[in-house]
Amino acid sequence: MSRLPRLLVFAGCVLLWAVRLVAAEYHVAPHGSDDAPGTAAAPFATVQRAQTAAAPGDTVFLRGGTYRLRERDIARTERIFAYVTLLDKSGEPGRPIRYVAWPGETPIFDFSAVKPADRRVHAFRVTGSWLHLEGFEVVGVQVTIRGHTQSICIDVQGSHNVIEQLSLHDGMAIGVWIGDGAHNLVLNCDAYRNHDPVSGDGRGGNVDGFGYHGRKGSVGNVFRGCRAWFNSDDGFDFINSAEAVTAEDCWAFYNGYTPDFTARADGNGFKAGGHAGTPVARLPAPIPRHVVRRSVAVRNKANGFYANHHLGGVDFIHNTAWRNRVNFNLLGRLEDNATRVPGRGHRLFNNLGFAGGEELAQLDAAASTVAGNSFLGDWAATAADFVGLDEADLTRPRGPKGELPVTSLLRLALGSRAIDAGVPLDGPFVGRAPDAGAFEAGTGR
């Protein structure tokens, strides 16, 4: 080949590479067609079709309206699973593939008609990495199996994904469930009014708002700014995890109940660990140490913050519990898998409990590190310690960027004994010492 053709081929390759660096935009709409080009004027109909077109750095805009999924939309069946939308194409570091709501619009994905017999329905299964899902709702996810089972709205198996400002509600499924993958962030999401009346005894014993059950290597996963309420089992459930997870600035309330406060399943706000009856020889090494901080648990059926027999201890830091049956329950077990004992090895700093049926249960304080809390001290919180106690504040709308609503609920009143009652840790504080509880007075946070 002569020099000129070689230069032309090289220039053509460079041009194609440069064009691909310019991120593309695709559109999906309820009235769209998967035979369309995916433009704003001629959008796709399904997220699954948009994935085939998208490449790292691209954005898929989801237009407002209701997407009514059918069984024909199931992307893959595998063993007992039906993956309706399967996101298995990855972005790249710094160039995620984004599936986001069009500004000012609300896409709603309705799975109430997806009822494959004897299958676990996973509405969105995310096995890809470097993806960003933002700003849509998932409703009506079904359960079709009578025995022990679960369905899932957002099933995360990849890494470096962001799940942001999703509302997962009024179905029979877990909201967000992380089973594998590392460094995923679940940010400012809501999971509520989810209950499975079909499987087992009909109490909905597997329907949590948010679940983390990561395999070995699934490190660095975080739930931040999320709310879970009226889920028939737990708000947040971290049982049977091989790696540690963090929940911070999260709220869990009314779990274990239906909206009319009929009792359903377990009803813990934060079930922060445990490995059920797993023999000690089969426990992960090291046993993960979960962290729950700056979080709120209100009026859950059972416990607000619960260690669930977790060996090795859990970190509960700067949390507020109100009106739970037990506000803080640190129950442990012996290595015989049978004997319940007060939990050991826990770290409890600057927590605040108020008006629980019991403030603190099952803690071996001598074998744990405990400081700056309202329990095991010389004072107990009363209503006078708080600016507001209006439970309606828990479900107020989020801020313009998806942030939790700033209200007077459980904020510390001037002169509260919780002010400056904590011990200094790593974070900033106002006054002589940090406050006890989830909210630092004088910061607006």
Question: Predicted segment positions?
Answer:
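Acidic Gly/Asp/Thr-rich repetitive segments characteristic of extracellular carbohydrate-active
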Residues: 30-69, 75, 83-87, 435-438
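Bacterial N-terminal signal peptides that target proteins for export
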Residues: 1-11
